[in-house]
């Protein structure tokens, strides 16, 4: 692909991404910026007259667990906007743990996008080896363990009980799935392209790509660089971005500069119940002020928001910012779901986190570290942030982002991302890379 094909402005965007949740959007945006692509994240489908000057635009939706018809409609609206802005290639982004049951939305949305683009074939690749998500013979692993044997089997919204991505994909879509094995990927991008053509000629609609390591990601990125529609996690997008920037060079510092964290007070809000977030909360509350959200009060007490806000404001003298969390281990989560109902409890918690973020913004807080995709969506919407510029990475797939037109910075973390020290690391990066 010649270097002259790369964009210089809104009329020639390289890549348009449709992400099925907020943290997934910042995840992929962080990898694109990390390869030197100027990237903007827009929260929801923007107005028709919005002008954007970027190499890549990521549109974040809340389409992972909503009704299928809504997910399709919103995804097609995002595609239409990207097409109107002369986007050259399209990427449907979902989680590296796939997060989609047999009644899930990944298959239906993929089918709708293929049909809208007049295409018959695409790839499926949630792999993100740098975070331990690998695919072997079409099976998805997390740190060497089958996905269905990890904590994802207990996910409150999208429990993953089958690790075979081909089988999951076929259960919720209109076509057949095949596999490009790691032995083929080892042979290079030309071999992968040949194998993709063979699968398509056999009537396969979705090619699940094996990826065991970083070299595989780079090979796959080159192999799919000309496909009209690509679907996957941020790993494949990272490989694609590397292929593009090898041709034109990259300036990561310049790409990150627009999203440098603002100065100001910080709060941590954690709604994820993943294994890693439980470990992160435990590590942080051992050294910093932390308050567990009372689920019953979140549901039944309208004045509980005042209690939470007053507690956060009272921690201003502490060396480390305060943490408010609804994070809990699986057995406690199960008890909450049985007592209150999973959807009812989740909705109340998300709403309360949104209210709290809005209240703290009014009190002068400018940095929000948020754990959990649903929580991140609630906080972003409550803060009325329509889009982000993408800043420095805290951990693979988790950058600092800065509100467009608002002096607010957020770190929006998918549940299982980051190390146990993530909450500390996010603050360190903000203090080092923030506005001088």
UniProtKB/Swiss-Prot annotation:
Entry EC number(s):
2.7.1.217
List positions binding ATP: 272, 372-375, 415
Xref: InterPro entries? 4-carb_acid_sugar_kinase_N, 4-carb_acid_sugar_kinase_N_sf, NBD_C, NBD_C_sf, OtnK
Gene3D superfamilies in UniProt: Four-carbon acid sugar kinase, nucleotide binding domain, Putative sugar-binding, N-terminal domain
The record's keywords, sorted A to Z, are: ATP-binding, Carbohydrate metabolism, Kinase, Nucleotide-binding, Transferase
Record bears the keyword Calcium: no
Q: Name one GO molecular function term.
A: kinase activity
Q: Does the keyword NAD apply?
A: no
Catalysed reactions listed for this entry: 3-dehydro-L-erythronate + ATP = 3-dehydro-4-O-phospho-L-erythronate + ADP + H(+); 3-dehydro-D-erythronate + ATP = 3-dehydro-4-O-phospho-D-erythronate + ADP + H(+)
Free-text function comment from the UniProt entry: Catalyzes the ATP-dependent phosphorylation of 3-oxo-tetronate to 3-oxo-tetronate 4-phosphate.
Q: Which family does it belong to?
A: Belongs to the four-carbon acid sugar kinase family.
Instruction: Return the NCBIfam families for the record.
Output: OxoTetrKin (NF043035)
Name the record gives this protein: 3-oxo-tetronate kinase
The UniProt gene name for this protein comes to otnK
